[in-house]
């Protein structure tokens, strides 16, 4: 545990510093803000690949969705804790870089950061203070399969990050941006929303239950927890859909005009 925590505490900030240094050396025309924001997205993508890979390994290794075990289901959670702390700081650093030319007081920058990122900060706090204790202690030796499923939700993150990078570089007009937008919607829908019916279906298949019977055959708090987890994902997916509609409507609107 301690070794994994220490490894994560060194790996993610170290990777961020390395990416920032490499970008400033290789792209001297980019501003410091560009380098910091893009480095943040690169680190997020690396974490997403590691989490998704861990999740797939866990899922494939668990023959029983309840009692199946794999060491990554616990060990990667310890690796995740330093990432969540690092990512919270990285988001604040991006806000500071974005507004540093405005000579704002640090307290005002912090308030704006908390205001602009309320949902994401809440998301990180829930993971650290609720999901980590559940995953590491409260669930006992059960449910590694479902922990692996939750890890695979990160599959959409590299596509989200690439979209943010393209926006930062003012490349919203490119074909790459549009294709990436479609992939973002597809992976977000499948891995962050449809993931939950898949977990219910997997449990039902093993227990001989239909998908509709599963919610009534598991503890009520499991349904409540899943509802709290999927609610922000649905909200974010709706925002992505609205953004996609605006993106693909713009050329048609200009043509009609």
Swiss-Prot record:
Interacts with GGT7 isoform 3 and SLC3A2. Residues 33-249 form the TLC domain. It is found in: Cell membrane. GO terms for biological process: lipid homeostasis. Pfam families: TRAM_LAG1_CLN8. It is a multi-pass membrane protein. This is TLC domain-containing protein 3A. The chain crosses the membrane at residues 1-21, 42-62, 77-97, 113-135, 142-162, 181-201, 220-240. Its main location: membrane. Keywords: Cell membrane, Membrane, Transmembrane, Transmembrane helix. It comes from Homo sapiens. GO terms for cellular component: endoplasmic reticulum; plasma membrane. The gene is TLCD3A. Highly expressed in pancreas. Detected at intermediate levels in heart, placenta and kidney, and at low levels in brain, liver and skeletal muscle. Not detected in normal lung.
């Amino acid at each position: 545990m301690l070794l994994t925590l220490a490894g994560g505490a060194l790996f993610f900030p170290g990777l961020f510093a390395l990416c920032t240094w490499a970008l400033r050396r290789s792209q001297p025309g980019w501003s410091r803000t560009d380098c910091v924001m893009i480095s943040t997205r690169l680190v997020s993508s690396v974490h997403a690949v590691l989490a998704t890979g861990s999740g797939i390994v866990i899922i494939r290794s668990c023959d029983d969705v309840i009692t199946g075990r794999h060491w990554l289901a616990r060990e990667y959670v310890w690796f995740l804790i330093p990432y969540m702390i690092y990512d919270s700081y990285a988001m604040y650093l991006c806000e500071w870089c974005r507004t540093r030319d405005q000579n704002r007081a640090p307290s005002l920058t912090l308030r704006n950061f908390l205001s602009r990122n309320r949902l994401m900060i809440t998301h990180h706090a829930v993971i650290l203070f609720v999901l980590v204790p559940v995953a590491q202690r409260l669930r006992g030796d059960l449910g590694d399969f479902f922990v692996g499923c939750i890890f695979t939700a990160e599959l959409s993150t590299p596509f989200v990050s690439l979209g943010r990078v393209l926006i930062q570089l003012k490349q919203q007009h490119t074909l790459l941006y549009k294709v990436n937008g479609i992939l973002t919607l597809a992976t977000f829908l499948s891995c962050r929303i449809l993931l939950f019916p898949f977990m219910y279906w997997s449990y039902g298949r093993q227990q001989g239950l239909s998908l509709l019977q599963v919610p009534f055959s598991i503890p009520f708090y499991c349904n409540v927890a899943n509802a709290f987890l999927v609610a922000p994902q649905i909200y974010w997916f709706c925002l992505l859909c609205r953004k996609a509609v605006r993106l693909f409507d713009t050329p048609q609107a200009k043509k009609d005009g």
